[in-house]
Structure formats: structure tokens, C-alpha cells
């Protein structure tokens, strides 16, 4: 314990990090949500007071919150009770708000916002639409992070990063981007693809996995023999890694291209390396976490074909062993540059700006970046479209038999009160695995299908740095850590748009992105995801902070 305490002091764990989670009016927003979560089943009559509207506070601004975001406390407790079958035991009767809409959309992420957008196109501008969202902010996976370092505003994505391969989008999806004012060709101007040209990828070998702590710069840039000479790896592992990257042998000789693809689809990448490439077990830890950034599991749980067909978007590593197979290059992909400074949060914000005039100022894809959303305008009485945050839907059902009903009733919890609204239609654009619990009329077969998937547990951490001089001095822009708590740490995407200027000089503040996937190697893939999600839910913020500082 003394050693742990000394290490914490060395890491600065006792030094205060400013967290705006509980300040001024924001305390009402976040703290109130947490407090009400303890008794989310209280009916309006039992609660005996009006539902609070923390969003009306001038200080309510979720993008500026720090600490644990994503599925933050207050966003999931009601849903967990619904899942566990305990919610309705004490829920009582919902209070009818008296509201009636043409459409209620469950979920305020990009899919829910887009559903409202398309419905309004079809039904007309006078259509009355209510969007219910359980989180304290809209966007779903497309959230926005804001940091202030002195007077400098830094932006980063709070989830989904980029418009990935837009050339493959459907006509409808491409049309939506165009209608929102997103001009894809502008990203070639805004994304500074040369800023990091002089900075290389580094690999951090940790003592727990490799026997000593060592950072080696030049991964993928130096000749492999020169790079590996500095690595704390057994000589056999070094020889195997160098060989599999450089000899370009056909490890599946005798098979046709179709047979090779079939075989690669049947085996994991770990099996491909060990069985066909004859890579020793000592070398496998170097490759173990390569698939984390896309698949959230290691090389033992991802097919070799998936690795071949999905090269790393960050160009932090390259999968070895495929160059000599004669399968050509993976299908052409668009460059990974279609990135707003706040990631795809700008798409969600453009949708909200279109749906709710006055909520976010401006008119273009450039001015959306620095525009401040007015959360008090999202749920205005009398507005055609209303977006209601901090509202967890617990039931959606027809009023009457499904084949004859003219209305849908949607029950939700907000501020500790159970409420209901009515609508002519309802779209469930929420977390798919919750739909069987909140829509009892679904056929059992469809419920089973919705239960099948398991979400990948990604932990995206964004850290505001006072400057990035240490990275410039080391000559690196990203660090791969095969055995580390975070498998990747990299400087943010270099995008300047409108009035937002990316920090180009090492003396300027910078956002550092860190990736962790809490998977459990050895278990089946879905079991790893479930175990990882449990770990994530049980991990205190101090653990993340300690490993960020380490």
C-alpha cells in the first residue's frame, strides 16, 4: 500500500484536476439526475411536484463536462431496472402530460435526429415531433467535448470520430450530408495532412508484458531489423517479426485466391501467424492488441480475413503476413480525413439546428464548429420539433390492438417522475438491445434477434495538454502499447474549420486521444464484450486517471 501511495504521489494523483461535473447550475443537471435515479419509478402523483427542467439553466452545457461521459451516471439506471424486471413492480401509473404529437422518436442520436428530419420532410414543416433522449446531451455516440486551456478552446469527439468512407454511402445518406451543408471536398482543405509528416509512430513496451519499460520510436518507418534491435524482445521473437514483415512469402501456397479467403475467414489472425507464418508464441504479444481500435478484442478473436480487409485507420501499425498471398490490396478506402474538430457531433448539431431554429446559430458547416448550442431552446412549448433530454423511455405500445390503434403511448421517466405522451407514430431509434424491454408487443423472434448483438466496450479518453513539446522532442505523434492499459495514444486529428484553429505549434495546447478496450483474451468474442462492459461499469474514475498519468 505504501508503494502504491508513493506511486500515486509521483503521478500527481493528489493534484487537483478541474472537473466541471458539479459546478453552479450544472450540478442541478448532473447531480439531480443521479439523485433521482435512486427512485426512478415514482409516479407524478407520488412525487408531488413539477418535473424539473435543468436544461433551462443558463449554465447547462454538457459539452464542457469532464470526468466520466458516454453512458454517464443518470443515463442508464432506469434502463437497468427495466432490464432486470424490477421497474414495473413499483412504478405506479404514469401521469399523462396531455401532449400529443404526430411522431415520437425514442433516441436523440444521429439516427433519431435523422428519423425526425426525414419524417418532417415527408409530413411537412408543421408536423409535431418529440424526440426523447435518456442522456444529458443529444448526439448518442456523436457527442462533443470542449476543453478550455487558458483562453484557448480545444474540441474533440466524444465518440464517433469521422465520416468513414463516404463514397460508399447510399444516395439517401449522401443527400442528407448535402442538405445539411456538408461539402466533403472541403475536408481536403481543412485537414492538415502534412502536420505530422516529420513525426513517427512509437511503440511502448511495458515491463509487465516485456520485462522492462522502453519506448522505441520509428515503428513502420525504420527498417524492421533496426527498430527491433531496440525492442526488449527475445531474439527469436525479433527474427519472427522481422521475417513476417519483410519476406513476403505465400504462407497459403497451393490454395486459389478464393480458397485463401475462405481459410482466412475460418481462422483467427493469431492462428494465421502461428500456424501458417510459423511465428513463435514469444512474438505474439507484439501483435496482440492490433485489432483493438476497430474490433475491441485481440488477435485471437478476430478472423485473419477481417484483419486483411480492415487496415488501421490511424496508420499506427500494419498487419503482417499478407503481402505475399497474391490477394492484392484490400478494397480501396477513402482517406480518413472527413473529420470535424468535434467528430460527428457536428452532424448531430447540424441536424438539431435544422430541426429546431434558434437552438444553434449559424448557417454553414464551418460556423457550426464554434457555435454554442442553446439547450434552453431544445424543448420549447409550442415548437413543431422538441428535443427532451434526461428522459428515459420505459414503454412504447399501441393504444388498443396494434392492427386497429390510432395512437401510440410512450412512457418515460424524467426527474424521477413517470410520464406518458401520445403520438400518431413512434420510431425506436435507440439502443437496440433495450427495445425488447420497452416494446412488449414485439414478436418473440424479433426480440431474440435484437438480444443477439453485444456492444463493443470502447473507452475513448481525451486529455487536454498544456503543450505537445514532449511529443515533438521524441519525434512521435502516436504511441502503440501492445501490453499497455491504453493500447493507443495519439495527438488529435489536425483539422481547422471556420474560426476554429487547430494547434499547429508544439508550444500550443493539444488534445491527446487514448484508447482502451477492456476485453478478456481467451473467452469467445461476445463473452469478452460482456466481461469488458462489466469491467467498465465497475471501474472508478480514479483508475482511469491513474493510468492516464502513468
Task: Walk through the language-model features, giving the residues of each.
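N-terminal secretory signal peptides
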Residues: 1-17, 21, 45
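N-terminal export signals
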Residues: 15, 21-43
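Glycine-rich active-site loop/strand segments that organize a redox cofactor
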Residues: 57, 61-64, 139-171, 309-330
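N-terminal Rossmann-like FAD-binding beta1-loop-alpha1 element of flavoenzymes
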Residues: 102-130
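Glycine-rich FAD pyrophosphate-binding loop
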Residues: 120-146
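Dinucleotide-binding Rossmann-like beta1-alpha1 core, especially the glycine-rich loop
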Residues: 150-240
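Active-site/ligand-binding neighborhood in enzyme catalytic cores
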Residues: 246-391, 402-405
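C-terminal segments that line or cap access tunnels to active or ligand-binding sites in enzymes
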Residues: 328, 332-339, 397, 401, ...
Amino acid at each position: 500500500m505504501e508503494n502504491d501511495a508513493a506511486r500515486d504521489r509521483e503521478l500527481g494523483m493528489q493534484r487537483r484536476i478541474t472537473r466541471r461535473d458539479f459546478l453552479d447550475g450544472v450540478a442541478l443537471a448532473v447531480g439531480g439526475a443521479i439523485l433521482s435515479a435512486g427512485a426512478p419509478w415514482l409516479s407524478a402523483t407520488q412525487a408531488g411536484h413539477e418535473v424539473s427542467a435543468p436544461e433551462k439553466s443558463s449554465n447547462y452545457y454538457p459539452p464542457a463536462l469532464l470526468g466520466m461521459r458516454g453512458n454517464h451516471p443518470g443515463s442508464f439506471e432506469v434502463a437497468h431496472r427495466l432490464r432486470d424486471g424490477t421497474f414495473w413492480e413499483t412504478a405506479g401509473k404514469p401521469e399523462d402530460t396531455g401532449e400529443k404529437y404526430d411522431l415520437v422518436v425514442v433516441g436523440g442520436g444521429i439516427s433519431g435526429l435523422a428519423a425526425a428530419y426525414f419524417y418532417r420532410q415527408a409530413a411537412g414543416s408543421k408536423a409535431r415531433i418529440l424526440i426523447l433522449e435518456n442522456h444529458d446531451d443529444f448526439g448518442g455516440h456523436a457527442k462533443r467535448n470542449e476543453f478550455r486551456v487558458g483562453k484557448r478552446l480545444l474540441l474533440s469527439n466524444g465518440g464517433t470520430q469521422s465520416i468513414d468512407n463516404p463514397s460508399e454511402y447510399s444516395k439517401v445518406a449522401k443527400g442528407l450530408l448535402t442538405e445539411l451543408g456538408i461539402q466533403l471536398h472541403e475536408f481536403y482543405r481543412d485537414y492538415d495532412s502534412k502536420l505530422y509528416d516529420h513525426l513517427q509512430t512509437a511503440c511502448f513496451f511495458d515491463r509487465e508484458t516485456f520485462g522492462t519499460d522502453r519506448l522505441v520510436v520509428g515503428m513502420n518507418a525504420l527498417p524492421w531489423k533496426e527498430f527491433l534491435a531496440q525492442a526488449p524482445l527475445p531474439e527469436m521473437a525479433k527474427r519472427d517479426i522481422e521475417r513476417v514483415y519483410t519476406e513476403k512469402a505465400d504462407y497459403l501456397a497451393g490454395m486459389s485466391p478464393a480458397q485463401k479467403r475462405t481459410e482466412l475467414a475460418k481462422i483467427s489472425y493469431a492462428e494465421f501467424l502461428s500456424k501458417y507464418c510459423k511465428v513463435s508464441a514469444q512474438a505474439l504479444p507484439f501483435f496482440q492488441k492490433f485489432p483493438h481500435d476497430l474490433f475491441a478484442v485481440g488477435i485471437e478473436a478476430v478472423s485473419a480475413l477481417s484483419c486483411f480487409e480492415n487496415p488501421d485507420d490511424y496508420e499506427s501499425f500494419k498487419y503482417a503476413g499478407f503481402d505475399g498471398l497474391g490477394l492484392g490490396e484490400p478494397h480501396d478506402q477513402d482517406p480518413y480525413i472527413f473529420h470535424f474538430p468535434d467528430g460527428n457531433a457536428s452532424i448531430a448539431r447540424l441536424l438539431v439546428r435544422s430541426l429546431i431554429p434558434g437552438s444553434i446559430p449559424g448557417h454553414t458547416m464551418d460556423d457550426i464548429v464554434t457555435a454554442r448550442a442553446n439547450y434552453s431552446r431544445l424543448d420549447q412549448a409550442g415548437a413543431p420539433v422538441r428535443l427532451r433530454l434526461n428522459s428515459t423511455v420505459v414503454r412504447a405500445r399501441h393504444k388498443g390492438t396494434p392492427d386497429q390503434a390510432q395512437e401510440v403511448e410512450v412512457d418515460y421517466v424524467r426527474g424521477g417522475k413517470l410520464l406518458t405522451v401520445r403520438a400518431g407514430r413512434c420510431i425506436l431509434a435507440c439502443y437496440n438491445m433495450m427495445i425488447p424491454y420497452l416494446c412488449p408487443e414485439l414478436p418473440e423472434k424479433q426480440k431474440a434477434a435484437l438480444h443477439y448483438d453485444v456492444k463493443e466496450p470502447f473507452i475513448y479518453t481525451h486529455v487536454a495538454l498544456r503543450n505537445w513539446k514532449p511529443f515533438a522532442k521524441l519525434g512521435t505523434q502516436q504511441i502503440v502499447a501492445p501490453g499497455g492499459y491504453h493500447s493507443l495514444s495519439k495527438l488529435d486529428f489536425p483539422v481547422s474549420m471556420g474560426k476554429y484553429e487547430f494547434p499547429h505549434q508544439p508550444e500550443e495546447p493539444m488534445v491527446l486521444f487514448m484508447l482502451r478496450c477492456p476485453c478478456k483474451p481467451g473467452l469467445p468474442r461476445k463473452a469478452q464484450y460482456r466481461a469488458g462492459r462489466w469491467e467498465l461499469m465497475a471501474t472508478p474514475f480514479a483508475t482511469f486517471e491513474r493510468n492516464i498519468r502513468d
